[in-house]
Amino acid sequence: MIKTLAISLAMLCLLPIAGRAQNNAQRAQGTGQPAQAFELRQESDSLYRVVATGGDNNDAKGGDKANGWRLPYPVYQFQTGDVDGDGSEDAMVGVVKGTRFYPQKARRLFIFKQIDGHSSNGETCKKVRPMWMGSKLGGILEDFRFIAPADTADTTNTALPSDSATGDRRGRIRALESTTDSLYVVSDYVWSGFGMKFDRFIIKGVDKLTAIKTFSQ
């Protein structure tokens, strides 16, 4: 059973995760990109699975367990959109876990893509595979959301050219991050070919409420 998830940041009111992914898919359809191709399914309190929903995938062709990606961690966010600008939809999942280089449990960002494969029955199907399972971004990650290319020429920095003008088809991942001195920043990250890299600050060195307001715009 798919459960709708919601962000639990204090004093932050955002759309449920499933709804936000659906909104991303609707925006993608308006730009000629394919409809939503992923679902996040909850199997227990701390076990989730990212599954491919595009094409001819169904349980008879090997099932979600064979074609999806298992996430045995708490999940705080789920978004979909074209991260690397290749014209196909990717999945962004926020999980709470430690990593090899940062063993303390914290909010992380995983990015997944679909690839062509074969089910256990030998039939063609879509499989979910990781693009990036990064240890961390720049600061202490609190939340993130996907910004489609058409949305990135925002009014927070009018000096930047629009993505339509530059021809950049990559979406941005907008991150709400805290710092070691208890301040907050909102930053944009873009795909660099082998992971996410810092692109620009939207706002920095501010209190939590100001950062949340900017992040939510």
Where are these regions (language model features)?
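Bacterial N-terminal signal peptides that target proteins for export
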Residues: 1-6
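Beta-propeller-forming repeat regions
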Residues: 19-217
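Bacterial N-terminal signal peptides
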Residues: 8-16
